[in-house]
Regions:
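Short aromatic-rich membrane-water interface segments that cap or initiate transmembrane helices
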Residues: 34-49, 190-200
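Helix-loop junctions on the outward
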Residues: 14-42, 96
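Internal transmembrane alpha-helix with an interfacial aromatic "cap," most often the third helix
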Residues: 23-27, 45-78, 86-96, 119-127
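Membrane-interfacial loop-to-transmembrane alpha-helix junctions, especially the N-terminal start
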Residues: 1-11, 68-82, 131-141
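C-terminal transmembrane-bundle signature of multipass membrane proteins
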Residues: 119-246
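Aromatic-anchored segments of alpha-helical transmembrane domains
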Residues: 12-18, 82-94, 144-153
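Hydrophobic alpha-helical transmembrane segments of integral membrane proteins
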Residues: 81-104, 230-250
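Short helix-loop boundary/capping segments
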Residues: 84-140
Length: 251
């Protein structure tokens, strides 16, 4: 599991590093550099792959721990989050191509839902986890709930307000084909704070906190190490030597 976590994290960290170097404000096609690497189609493609890898890290970790703790809630959530985020990415592409922010409303709502599912899963498995692991689980829950609040109180309303403003102004949206041609060729270079200020909050968190979370998932202990001693003894594969090894590692 750790090798796969390393690969997934490497892809996500690379994607964030790339998007830090070539930031793009997708719908209005705003970028910092007049270079093909700053095109929306490149930036959005990198983001799609990176974000799927990031959520796959969480799904993998949650699936392994849920299997060890026999948590049905966690197991279902671990199987649901990647397909849900794939749908969210499709909504994002719809918004990017058509310039309609309604797709971003759906995208961010799904992200909030997925993180809420992850938090609920961690809450469900925490009673079966060792006491010294619970502060870490609590930290994940607090961070997750802060993210959910941010998404539904800040991010989703922001995109909803943009869509309403576009509707009131009678904006004409692009077709999918027109959008593909547009994101591949049009770049609006801007260094004005007014153009970027609404993007700063999520970009700052996304390219810092989320990166460290991704890296930390590589170092998550083996699933059995999360369990309380009594729970480990009930595992079918946990023989005396294995339990002793886990207890020694815990000490």
């Amino acid at each position: 599991m750790r090798r796969l976590q390393l690969i997934l994290s490497a892809v996500y960290v690379f994607g964030c590093a790339f998007r830090c170097a070539f930031p793009v404000y997708d719908v209005p096609r705003i970028c910092l550099f007049d270079h093909w690497l700053s095109s929306v189609i490149v930036g959005r493609s990198v983001a799609t792959v990176a974000e799927l890898c990031f959520v796959a890290q969480w799904a993998l970790m949650l699936h392994e721990i849920s299997r060890a703790t026999r948590s049905m809630v966690g197991r279902v959530a671990s199987l649901a989050v990647v397909p849900l985020i794939a749908i969210a990415e499709s909504c994002s592409w719809y918004s990017v191509l058509t310039t309609s922010n309604l797709g971003h409303v759906a995208e961010e709502s799904i992200w909030g839902l997925c993180v809420a599912l992850l938090v609920a899963s961690v809450v469900a498995i925490s009673p079966r986890c060792a006491a010294h692991r619970r502060p870490m689980l609590l930290g994940w829950c607090v961070a997750g709930m802060a993210y959910v609040v941010f998404m539904y109180c800040v991010d989703v309303p922001m995109y909803w307000a943009r869509w309403l403003a576009d509707e009131a102004a009678g904006r004409r949206y692009l077709s999918i084909v027109q959008g593909v041609l547009d994101v591949a060729s049009r770049r609006v270079v801007s260094h004005r704070w007014a153009d970027w200020k609404n993007e700063v909050a999520w970009m700052s968190l996304y390219f810092s906190v989320a990166v460290w979370i991704s890296i930390s998932l590589i170092h998550t202990p083996q699933p059995e190490a999360h369990l309380a001693t009594g729970e480990r003894r009930r595992l079918p594969s946990a023989g005396p030597l294995r339990i002793a090894s886990l207890d020694k590692r815990r000490a």
